[in-house]
C-alpha cells in the first residue's frame, strides 16, 4: 500500500502542476512569439475563399445544409493552406478552450480571439460566393426540369443556400463550432509545432 500511496501522491502532484501550467499558458502570446502570418493573414484567407471558390462547393450545400456546408467549405480552404505551408495558417484552435478560434490580423500585427465581426466577415465571404454560384446553377438548370419540378428543387436548394432554417446568431456559432472541432489541436502539441 505504500507504493500505491506514493504513486497516488505523485499523480496528485503532477495533476496540480498540469492545471497550474495550463492556466498560465497564454495562447496569444505563444502564437505571437512563434507564428507570424504577416504574408497571409485572416483577411487574406477570407479573400482566398473567393479566389478558390468552385462549383462543387454548391453541391456540398445541396447535399447537406447551410451550417454543415459553409463549415465544410471553410475547412476545405484551411486544409489547402495546411498542405501548402502549415506556418502560413492564420487560424488556429486548441482543445484547452472550447469553441475559441484564434486568428492573425495584419492590421494590428497580432493574433486575437475571433470575434463576431471577423466571424461574420468569413461567413459572408462564403455566402456571397454561394449566392453567385446558385444564380449560375439556376440559369443552367431551369430548362432541364419541368416547371413544377424545378420550382420544388429551386425552393429547397435556395433555403439551404441562404440558411433559412437557422436564426442568424445560432448558425454563425454553429459554423464556428464545426470549424473548431475540425481544426483544434491538443495543447500538448503546441510545443511540437516548432
Write out the residue ranges for each language-model feature.
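Extended amphipathic coiled-coil helices
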Residues: 22-194
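Heptad-repeat coiled-coil/leucine-zipper oligomerization helices
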Residues: 1-20
Amino acid at each position: 500500500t505504500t507504493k500505491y500511496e506514493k504513486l497516488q501522491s505523485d499523480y496528485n502532484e503532477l495533476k496540480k502542476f498540469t492545471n497550474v501550467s495550463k492556466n498560465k499558458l497564454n495562447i496569444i502570446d505563444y502564437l505571437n512569439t512563434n507564428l507570424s502570418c504577416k504574408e497571409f493573414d485572416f483577411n487574406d484567407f477570407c479573400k482566398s475563399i473567393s479566389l478558390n471558390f468552385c462549383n462543387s462547393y454548391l453541391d456540398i450545400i445541396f447535399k447537406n445544409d447551410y451550417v454543415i456546408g459553409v463549415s465544410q467549405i471553410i475547412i476545405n480552404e484551411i486544409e489547402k493552406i495546411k498542405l501548402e505551408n502549415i506556418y502560413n495558417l492564420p487560424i488556429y484552435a486548441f482543445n484547452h478552450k472550447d469553441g475559441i478560434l484564434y486568428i492573425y490580423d495584419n492590421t494590428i500585427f497580432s493574433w486575437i480571439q475571433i470575434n463576431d465581426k471577423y466571424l461574420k466577415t468569413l461567413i459572408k465571404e462564403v455566402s456571397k460566393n454561394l449566392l453567385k454560384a446558385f444564380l449560375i446553377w439556376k440559369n443552367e438548370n431551369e430548362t432541364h426540369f419541368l416547371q413544377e419540378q424545378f420550382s420544388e428543387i429551386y425552393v429547397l436548394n435556395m433555403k439551404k443556400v441562404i440558411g433559412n432554417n437557422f436564426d442568424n446568431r445560432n448558425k454563425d456559432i454553429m459554423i464556428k463550432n464545426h470549424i473548431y472541432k475540425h481544426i483544434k489541436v491538443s495543447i500538448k502539441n503546441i510545443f511540437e509545432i516548432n
